[in-house]
Each structure stands twice: as structure tokens, then as C-alpha cells.
From Swiss-Prot:
Pfam family, one: Ras
Cofactor(s) named in the record: Mg(2+)
Gene it is expressed from: RACD
Sample GO molecular function, one term: protein kinase binding
Regulation: Regulated by guanine nucleotide exchange factors (GEFs) which promote the exchange of bound GDP for free GTP, GTPase activating proteins (GAPs) which increase the GTP hydrolysis activity, and GDP dissociation inhibitors which inhibit the dissociation of the nucleotide from the GTPase.
Source taxonomy: Eukaryota, Amoebozoa, Evosea, Archamoebae, Mastigamoebida
Annotated residues for binding of GTP: 20, 22-25, 39, 42, 123, 125, 166
Protein name as catalogued: Rho-related protein racD
Description of its domains: The switch 1 and switch 2 motifs undergo large conformational changes during GTP/GDP cycle and play important roles in the interaction with downstream effectors.
Residues making up the propeptide: 198-200
Lipidation (S-geranylgeranyl cysteine): 197
Motif (Switch 1): 33-44
Motif stretch (Switch 2): 64-82
Keywords for the protein's UniProt record, in alphabetical order: Cell membrane, Cytoplasm, Cytoskeleton, GTP-binding, Hydrolase, Lipoprotein, Magnesium, Membrane, Metal-binding, Methylation, Nucleotide-binding, Prenylation
């Protein structure tokens, strides 16, 4: 990352979703290239750094939020002036998937009615984890598919759907690259179907 001049455009991305879906891991892995060994709810400090995207200087701000109900009064304090919300769910948690439309969409729309959103499926490495698949099967469940994620994004009028794994870093950089480009209007993903923007 290179130093950005004072007139650089600011890009504010806010990550929301249920607790334990991997929001903090996403941010830590993206900014440090290291996967945290232990789960500690919301330990990531807001990350601000100058960088250059396609030759254009920007100041990138990444905001983590706590998904737990205990933080419902504090969480909205991070919402004002957000350029793009990343609504995250775990592909191995049907509850977190359902809560995107039943909880997180209404919450951010209440505070930021004209907000832009993208939907992000996390923990995609678990789709191939036999032990996890058996555990879900015991509960009469199965991992959320890419197609389900795409449909969710379309149903809630999100700009696009993408998915990634913080553990393997598969798709991780692409999620944030896409988010930054959406804010900077460098691509036309908002004019395409969510399927065009989905990352397999």
C-alpha cells in the first residue's frame, strides 16, 4: 500500500452479520494475512489505511461490528456515512443465512435507508468438510449453496453476492476488491445480475 494524498477518496466498508460467522476473521486475514487461532468476539479495531486502486489513491476504512444482541445499541454507531455494507452469513449456518433478510437488512435499512449492500457467504472451506457435512445432516440441514446466496442477494436488492474462506483465503481478496470497485464505480456489477458477480 502506498501513501495517499489528503484529497484521496475515502471508502468506508462496514461488515455486519450474526456472531461467529467469521466477520472478524475476514478482516484480520485480509489486513494481516494471518488467520486467528482462537475465536474472540469483535477484537478487530477499525482499520484505516491509504492505498492505491487502479492508480487512484483512496483511504480505506474497514469497520467490524458485533453480531450479538448485547451490542444492538452500540452497533448502529458505526453505520453513518457507510459506502457499502457487507452482509455476511456462514454457508454452514442456515440461521445466519435467514437472518440476513429477517434481521440485518431491516436494521441497516432503518438507519441507512439508501445504503448499498453486497452479500458475502463465509467459511466456504467447510462445504468440503466431511465431519461438518455429517453434523449438518444429523440436524437435517446442509450447506447453503452458491445459488441460494445469489437468490438472497437478488431478493434483497443487494448489488451482488460473493463468497470466500478466510481460512484458505479462497476468494478473500476478491471480495474486498469488488467492494472497493463498487464504491469507486470502477465496474458495472451493479448493472448486472448478482450471478455475474458471484465468486465460485
Amino acid at each position: 500500500m502506498s501513501a495517499a494524498p489528503t484529497d484521496a477518496k475515502s471508502v468506508k466498508l462496514v461488515v455486519v452479520g450474526d456472531g461467529a460467522v467469521g466477520k472478524t476473521c475476514l478482516l484480520i486475514c485480509y489486513t494481516t494475512n494471518e488467520f486467528p487461532k482462537d475465536y474472540v468476539p469483535t477484537v478487530f479495531d477499525n482499520y484505516m489505511a491509504p492505498m492505491t486502486v487502479d492508480g487512484e489513491p483512496i483511504n480505506l476504512g474497514l469497520w467490524d461490528t458485533a453480531g450479538q444482541e448485547d451490542y444492538e445499541q452500540l452497533r448502529p454507531l458505526s453505520y453513518p456515512n457507510t459506502d457499502l455494507f457487507l452482509l455476511c452469513f456462514s454457508v454452514i449456518s442456515r440461521t445466519s443465512f435467514n437472518n440476513i433478510s429477517s434481521k440485518w437488512l431491516p436494521e441497516i435499512k432503518h438507519y441507512e435507508p439508501k445504503c448499498k449492500m453486497m452479500v458475502v457467504g463465509t467459511k466456504t472451506d467447510c462445504r468440503n468438510d466431511e465431519a461438518m457435512i455429517r453434523k449438518l445432516a444429523d440436524e437435517n440441514q446442509k450447506p447453503i449453496t452458491t445459488e441460494e446466496g445469489e437468490k438472497l442477494a437478488k431478493d434483497i436488492k443487494a448489488i451482488c453476492y460473493m463468497e470466500c474462506s478466510a481460512l484458505t483465503r479462497s476468494g478473500l481478496n476478491q471480495v474486498f476488491d469488488e467492494a472497493i470497485h463498487i464504491v469507486l464505480n470502477k465496474n458495472q456489477s451493479s448493472k448486472k445480475s448478482s450471478k455475474k458477480c458471484a465468486l465460485l
